[in-house]
Every structure is written in C-alpha cells, then in structure tokens.
C-alpha cells in the first residue's frame, strides 16, 4: 500500500472514529496499526483517560499481539468479529480490521452486543 493510500485509509478511519465519539456511551475510539501505534481517533473531548500515555501504549501493543494470536484459530473457529471485556470502570471492545484493530471503550452500563452492532454499523465493518 502506498503512502497516499495509507494516508487516505487513516483519514477515513479518523472520520469513523470521530463519528463513534459522537455516541454518548463511547469514551474512546481509535485505530491501532500493526506496530501498536494509535493512527486515528482517540479519547472523547472532555473525557479523562483512565490510563496514562505509557500504559495506553502498552495496551495497544498487547492488543495487537492478542489479536494476531487469535488469528491462528480463524481456520477452525472462524474469524473474530469482535472481542469485549466488561471491566469495573469501562467496557473495552476490539474489532480486527485486516492487520489493524479498532479499539473502543464505552461506559459500563452498555449492552455489549447492541453496542458492538452499533459500532460495526457506524464504522462500516
């Protein structure tokens, strides 16, 4: 993929992340590249992050590693549509997109399946 194509792809995902952040239950929406870097999106304006920058970078790296490890089972179990964790302070969902991951965190009171469907619709995945 050329630099221009990458740039256009990341711009497209920036727009999708911004659309996700308009939803009241969404705290964070970002695209993580295969190197574990946030390349589009981020935290909703006015929202206080639950992790500092260093911990977020660790989270991104761990997420990419986990998603790539899960792909080993795609042949037998089918591709992962999304993964979700309900934590005490946030619901965290990840959506594999080729070799990247859309990472979304939401308020704890969300219905995970309903929210995941909404995210997939808004993000076009």
Language-model features: where?
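Non-catalytic interaction/Regulatory regions outside core domains
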Residues: 1-125
């Amino acid at each position: 993929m050329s630099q221009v194509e990458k740039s256009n792809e990341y711009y497209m995902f920036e727009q999708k992340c911004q659309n996700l952040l308009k939803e009241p239950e969404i705290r964070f929406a970002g695209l993580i590249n295969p190197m574990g870097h946030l390349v589009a999106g981020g935290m909703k304006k006015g929202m206080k992050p639950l992790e500092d920058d260093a911990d977020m970078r660790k989270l991104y790296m761990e997420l990419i590693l986990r998603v790539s490890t899960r792909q080993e089972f795609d042949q037998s179990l089918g591709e992962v549509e999304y993964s979700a964790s309900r934590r005490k302070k946030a619901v965290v969902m990840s959506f594999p997109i080729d070799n990247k991951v859309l990472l979304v965190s939401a308020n704890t009171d969300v219905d995970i399946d309903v929210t995941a469907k909404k995210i997939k619709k808004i993000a076009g995945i």
